[in-house]
From Swiss-Prot:
GO molecular function ontology, one term from the record: ion channel inhibitor activity
Tissues in which the UniProt entry reports expression: Expressed by the venom gland.
Protein name: Mu/omega-theraphotoxin-Tap2a
Keyword Disulfide bond: yes
Presence of keyword Disulfide bond: yes
Family per similarity comment: Belongs to the neurotoxin 10 (Hwtx-1) family. 59 (Tltx) subfamily.
Domains (record comment): The presence of a 'disulfide through disulfide knot' structurally defines this protein as a knottin.
Amino acid sequence: DCLGFMKPCDINNDKCCSSYVCGRNNHWCKFHL
C-alpha cells in the first residue's frame, strides 16, 4: 500500500505512491517535480 496525495508521510521511510514524494518541509505526499 502507498500513500496518496496530501497524506502525512515519513521523510526517512517514504511510502508515497510513485507519482508523489514526501515533502521535506511539511511531511506530506506531494507531486514529484
